[in-house]
């Protein structure tokens, strides 16, 4: 995640196609400025939040790619329902990304049925002894599923 315009330029020079902005750590002005800077350089800006109180700020920033972090970064607990509770409050033209707490194909299918456009998976893949197989399981390309 980035907090300064200089980092956006560095990311682009390093070949990045997208950046992550976390609403909880950026004020309104900086959130909009960083998003606009990234987009002016041809990069996508994934604007993430956890606290529902930040959703209006995220949308007001002009974000078209919005991530709901299912992990409470204060307590480090995950709750997949966070995305599902907020889905109807996010306009359909906004690309919705569900982040964290996605453990298996059933979770992916629940999110798909709810209209989530994309997922961000980290811990499940990093804990797997075979990351390729774990990705296949999440995508439903194998008969098995990713275990918890």
Give the label of every model feature segment.
Residues 85-89, 112, 127-148:
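C-terminal helical cap(s) of enzyme catalytic domains, especially alpha/beta-barrels
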Residues 32, 79-85:
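Charged helix-capping and loop-helix junction motifs
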Residues 83-97, 104, 122:
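Catalytic alpha/beta core domains of metabolic enzymes, predominantly
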Residues 1-5, 17-28, 41-55, 67-77, ...:
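Catalytic beta/alpha-barrel core
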Residues 8-30, 67-76, 114-135:
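Glycine-rich phosphate-binding active-site loops on the catalytic face of alpha/beta enzymes
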Residues 3-14, 50-62, 98, 102-121, ...:
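Catalytic cores of alpha/beta
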């Amino acid at each position: 995640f980035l907090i300064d315009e200089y980092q956006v330029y560095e990311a682009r020079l390093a070949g990045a196609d997208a950046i992550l902005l976390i609403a909880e750590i950026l004020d309104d002005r900086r959130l909009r400025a960083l998003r606009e800077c990234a987009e002016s350089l041809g990069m996508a800006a994934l604007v993430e939040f956890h606290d529902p109180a930040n959703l209006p700020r995220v949308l007001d920033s002009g974000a078209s790619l919005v991530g709901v972090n299912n992990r409470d970064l204060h307590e480090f607990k995950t709750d997949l329902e966070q995305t599902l509770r907020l889905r109807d409050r996010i306009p359909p033209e906004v690309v919705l990304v569900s982040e964290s707490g996605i453990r298996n194909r059933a979770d992916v299918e629940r999110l798909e049925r709810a209209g989530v456009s994309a997922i961000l998976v980290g811990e499940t893949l990093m804990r797997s002894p075979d990351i390729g197989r774990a990705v296949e399981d999440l995508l439903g390309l194998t008969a098995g599923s990713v275990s918890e």
